[in-house]
């Protein structure tokens, strides 16, 4: 993969990794990229959303795009090896690999892949994501998949970790009702708008996480054209599900808040299946966010 300033393939001023057309995900699958500020709960959200899609009868694949490779452990109940680690073992001869070497079945049949990434300060995470999709295509593992969810590292929107946007139909942004999360969300909106000039990705909406109220999020939504698709309060059962290494759907529905959270994830999955209307949002300038958020 190469990129040049002259072509600007992904928006004005872009130096992002350009998508190899041979690694496109097949038409027909609903492809979602989940972004948000680091530590906001993207992996929890992605895994529970994958589980919700599976409960609705969909064949789901979740791809973790973080070198920490901790995206899917609540689905698989274990830490699974990464694609990059497995490829290194065979000197990057992907033809020597079997699907079971890098894809693992999790809760309710959800298929799980951890792309991994290069050591800190080296290589390109976007290249690893591209190689993961290429490997899945070589083994015909995307042909019968209904939903693909990319769980993406932090709020990094460089050419590398913006790579999942090149495959996605929709981007969902996870945020809390606070300044830092919304500030990061604004940067992600700008990155998605740049990608949308040349790729099919569109904004799907906002997922409010660990937030009792929505006042600051709704202020931002009103100004930019975003919409809140789901709201998850700070329910302790979600925290405990991570410690139990399981999804919220494996928790006792009699426990406080569990059934409400399960229903909210199922509702979000249904909205996405029903062809959610893509949003036309415009990011704010940094000073505008600073002046917008907070209390009078």
Curated annotation (Swiss-Prot):
Cofactors required: [4Fe-4S] cluster
Enzyme class: oxidoreductase
GO terms assigned for molecular function: 4 iron, 4 sulfur cluster binding; ATP binding; metal ion binding; oxidoreductase activity, acting on iron-sulfur proteins as donors; oxidoreductase activity, acting on the CH-CH group of donors, iron-sulfur protein as acceptor
Signal peptide boundaries: none
UniProt binding sites for [4Fe-4S] cluster: 124, 158
EC number(s) stated in the UniProt entry for this protein: 1.3.7.7
Cofactor mode of binding and number, as noted: Binds 1 [4Fe-4S] cluster per dimer.
Cross-referenced HAMAP family: ChlL_BchL
Family classification: Belongs to the NifH/BchL/ChlL family.
UniProt-recorded name of the protein: Light-independent protochlorophyllide reductase iron-sulfur ATP-binding protein
């Amino acid at each position: 993969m190469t990129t040049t300033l002259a072509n600007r393939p992904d928006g004005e001023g872009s130096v992002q990794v350009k998508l190899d057309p041979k690694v496109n995900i097949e038409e027909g699958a609903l492809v979602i990229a989940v972004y948000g500020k680091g530590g906001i709960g993207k992996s929890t959200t992605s895994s529970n959303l994958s589980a919700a899609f599976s409960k609705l009868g969909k064949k789901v694949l979740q791809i973790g795009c973080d070198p920490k490779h901790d995206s899917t452990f609540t689905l698989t109940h274990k830490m699974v090896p990464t694609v990059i680690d497995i490829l290194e073992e065979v000197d990057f001869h992907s033809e020597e690999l079997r699907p079971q070497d890098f894809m693992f079945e999790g809760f309710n049949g959800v298929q799980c892949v951890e792309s991994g990434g290069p050591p800190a300060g080296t290589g390109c995470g976007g290249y690893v994501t591209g190689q993961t999709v290429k490997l899945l295509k070589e083994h015909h593992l995307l042909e019968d998949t209904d939903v693909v969810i990319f769980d993406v590292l932090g709020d990094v929107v460089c050419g590398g970790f913006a790579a999942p946007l090149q495959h996605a139909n929709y981007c969902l942004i996870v945020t809390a009702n606070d300044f830092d999360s919304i500030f990061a969300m604004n940067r992600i909106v700008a990155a998605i708008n740049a990608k949308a000039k040349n790729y099919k990705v569109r904004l799907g909406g906002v997922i409010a996480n660990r937030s009792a109220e929505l006042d600051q999020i709704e202020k931002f939504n009103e100004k930019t054209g975003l919409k809140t698709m789901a709201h998850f309060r700070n329910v302790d059962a979600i925290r405990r599900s991570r410690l139990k290494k399981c999804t919220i759907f494996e928790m006792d529905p009699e426990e406080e808040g569990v059934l409400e959270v399960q229903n909210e994830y199922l509702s979000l999955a249904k909205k996405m299946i029903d062809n959610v209307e893509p949003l036309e949002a415009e990011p704010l300038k940094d000073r505008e966010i600073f002046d917008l958020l907070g209390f009078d």
